[in-house]
Amino acid sequence: MKKDNFPPAKKVPEKYKPLPLVPEYILLPLWLVSLGAPNLIYSGILFADTLHILKWTAAGVPAAIALLIAGWRVMRYGSERVRVRLDLFALIWLAILVYCLLMPLWVNIMSPTAWCLEMVCFATVWVFYVLSASSFPEWGLRPVLLIGSINASVNVLFAELQIRGLNNFSFLDGTMFADFRRFSNIILPTPGNYIGNTAQQNMFGLWVAVAVLGGVYLYAYDAWRHDPSEHGRKAILPAVFVSLSVIILKYAVTLSSVLLGIAAALLLAAALVTGRRNIFSVSVLIMTAVNFWGLMNSTSRSATIALTLGLLVMLSVTLWKFARSYAIRFTAVLMVILCVFWASLYSPRSEQIVDKTADIIRNAENIGNRRGIWATSYAMFLEHPEGVGIGQYKWHYLEGQREGFRRFNAPLWYRWQYTHWAHNEFLQFFCEGGVIGGMLLLLMWVVWLIPALRGLIRGRHSITAGGNSEPDTNWVWAVSLVTLITFCAVFTRPFHRIENMVWLALAFALSNREFFPERLSFSILKSPSARKLTGAFCIVSSIAGCIYISSGIYGNYVLRQALSTNNEHLQLHYLNEAEKHPIVREDTMRNIGWHYMQAGEQRNNPEMLLRGFNILWSQFQREPHSEDISRLLNFAQRYQIEPALREIASYFRPGEYHLKRIPQRDASGRTVRALLLLNGPGSDDK
């Protein structure tokens, strides 16, 4: 048969080749920092915000740098070489962002500081998604998950030291390593807690759950890519060795430290038996075991159930889409996880695990003490269907709780409490974004879910057992992680930690890149003027974001200096300097109020006292917080500031307190009928 003679393809000149928004060799290191660093670092005592400011910096600045590069490349090369496309998912996300940006036009924003910070974080995560969808390399997931596993394992080590009160490295006293105690400040100083450097139990549980899911994926889908005809059998052996090591380590606590050496020998044997190049797979198994141990000892029910769902999704996809050998790999790593689960039942925190599990069964209607919080959130939504503004939930909580007591007649289960979060991210977004914002958020999830389900059902990517080609499987991890974090979002607050949101954004990007129809992606920047304008906007936004976070870092540092000095004039100087920086402005104003009140009490100066109270009361009306109630209440009773006293009293649960006029002598010796807040039921006096 005559062959067709086609002309040889012309080689595309280098200057006309298509370019990514950000080069892979630049994007991946930036993403490794943004994804790997925030959960391991904290601000420390040099800053007023001892936790978040450096986490925000580590997560956001790499995205800002990548945005700067993307803007420059768009301006320089144009749409001919740099293809800029936004899928429908990104456009809906952008619509939410724009809607929240415009909300101050019709909503009274109580705290501009919180609104601005939330908007910056929200925009940063959107940028992270767009750049990941367009430029993140498929091969980049392996180092990302490896960095995440290492980070989580170190956090588990930190948590083990914290729970034992050894986070100050006191066990090094009297040894040759005693000088290393000065490095103990790398661990969050929270002895008696099991939270690592995440600073919160559920967030620690979520982070190690994300790492466990990544470890399972690395072992089942990535570590055994070579020699697929045998990888099912080979994957079992190291899992058996690591499982035996877990069992031996469990008994080593009570039997003999000699067994620790046996366990180490088994781990070494696992590495030797599987070959030098497969030491990576053994390391992944060990870190996965450590991270699952941390998850169980965190006693976080939401994170544990979320991981279970994520693993079920991954297992279902594995059985439905891929060859039997993948299921064997998956089963091997699950064997290690089950051994760690068994060992955790004999750990010192096992009683808490059992008690919290039993509580959720006995008191299912209480939903882990969330029933009252959700009732308050529902009342807030009914009171403000247009939304209260992004980042404003916590400043409307006391008002929402007061409205909830009125609407629901304060049943016994509805106790007074205060929290910053709804412990349900979707409910909280309905409160903050209103009906429109909440529906857009749900639409975003639906737009992700439909193409993903369609792609899974159609049987794409299936291969035959013993095939010599390995499909791209990053989407398996992505779909599983979205499931995990979405479940956590129903009971906790992962959306309000940017260090979690960047992981969710990456998962969305990899999933949508695989399943989203091409017809639902839109090319933009076709005209030169739009290209230049957009590129310039990206550059300016990047620089502005870096300036904003730099200002916050310096403001936090200055505010810490103010709180650390006993010199009245120097403290006021530092406070006035810190007030210039937006991120800390509201906190600084509150501290200025306390400064004047303390100075007024020391000098017995009523004018300074009143000035301080007025500042604090103004701040309280913008940002009502439970920490301020008692001190403001005492001052209002002491100086009989009745409007403030009645407003504070209105926030308490009906029937537990009442206002009553009681005869008292004032400073001049006269008898007056002072209005006081008393315990117990009763009607309020006029």
Region locations from a protein language model:
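Alpha-helical transmembrane segments of multi-pass inner-membrane proteins
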Residues: K2, P18-I41, T57-G71, L97, ...
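Transmembrane alpha-helix boundary signature
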Residues: I69-R83, L101-T113
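A conserved mid-to-late transmembrane alpha helix and its immediate loop/hinge
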Residues: Q200, P385, A410-I450
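Hydrophobic alpha-helical transmembrane segments in integral membrane proteins
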Residues: L345-I361, A530-L570
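Short, hydrophobic transmembrane alpha-helix segments
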Residues: L40-L54, M75-E80, L249-V253
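C-terminal luminal/periplasmic domains and tails of membrane-associated envelope-modifying transferases
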Residues: Q561-K686
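A juxtamembrane structural motif centered on a specific transmembrane helix
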Residues: K2-L21, R458-T473, A507-I553, G682-D684
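Interfacial juxtamembrane loops and adjacent helix segments
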Residues: N167-I195, V354-G368, A375, A379, ...
